[in-house]
Amino acid sequence: KQLNQGVTHLMKKNKIAVHMGDGRLTAPGTLVVKADAGETELTAPNIIIATGARARDLPFAPADGQRIWTYRHAMVPPAMPTKLLVIGSGAIGIEFASFYNDMGAEVTVVEMMDRIVPVEDGDVSAFLEKALVKQGMTILTGAGVESLQADAGGVTAAIKDRDGTVRTDSFSHCIVAIGIVPNTEGIGLEALGIQTVRGHIQTDGLCRTNVPGIWAIGDVTAPPWLAHKASHEGVIAAEAIAGGHPHAMDPRNIPGCTYCHPQVASVGLTEGKAREAGHDV
C-alpha cells in the first residue's frame, strides 16, 4: 500500500493524469477507458502498452489463493507453509523455494526439464541443485505433476518421477511457477492488427509494434520477463517518442538473476548456446 501511494504521489507531482478503468484501443491514437462512471475516449499520437502478465495456472488445478498459490499469493501468504510443493524451477520457483526453505518449511521442487534453472549454464544448474539439496530441499528433475487436489487440510499431488513411477504425496501448500500469460485480452490488439508471438506483443529494438504510434514494453512483450528489462524499455520508448537519442536494446546483453542462496546471476550466452551458435568454446 505504501509503495502504491508513493507512486500515486509521484504521478500527481509530475502532473500525470490517471484514468482508472479498463482500457481498449479502438484506432491508432485512440483509447477508450471504461469505468463505473461511464466511458472516456482519450487520444494521443503515441500510446504505450504496458499491461504486464499474470501467472500461468495449471489447467487441471487453478490457483485458489488458499492452498494452491501463484507468486502473488506467495508474496503475502495467508499462512506459513509447513510442507511446500513448488512446481517449476525457473527464477520465481527457485526464489520462493529458497525463501520458504530458509523459513523452516519442508520444500520439494518438481521440474519437468532435466535440470533446475534451465536457462542458466549447465554447470550453474548442477552447482545450485547440490547447494539446495544440502540445505534440505528435495529436488525432482525430469518429473511432472499428474494431478493436484486441494482441500481445507492441504494439497495432495501425484508426481511422476524421471523413471515413470507415479507417487502420491501430501503438502500444506503448493506454489505454481510454470510461466506467465500476457495480459492482452480485451485491449483491442485484434482490431488494430497488432502482431503477437505466442500471445506476447511483437516489438522491434525501440519497442515499436507493427502499428505506427503503438508501443509496448515489459512482460506483455517477448522474454526475458525481468523488471530491469521492463524499466529500461520504458526509457527506450520514451526517448524514441521524444525524438532524442533513442538506442535499441540488445537482448543478449540483458543480465538475469535469481535471488536464492546461493545467488545466481548471468549475462550473455551459456556455454551450450555459444556452441550452438558455432563459437569455439
How would you describe each model-predicted region?
Residues K1-N4, T8, M75-V76, P81-L85, ...:
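Rossmann-like dinucleotide-binding cores of NAD(P)H-dependent redox enzymes
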Residues K1, I49-A50, V86, V176-A177, ...:
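Redox-cofactor binding/interface segments in oxidoreductases and associated redox assembly factors
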Residues T51-E106, V110, Q135-T138, E190-L192, ...:
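Glycine-rich dinucleotide-binding loop and its adjacent helix/turn
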Residues G65-M80, T168-H245:
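FAD-site-proximal beta/loop scaffold in flavoenzymes
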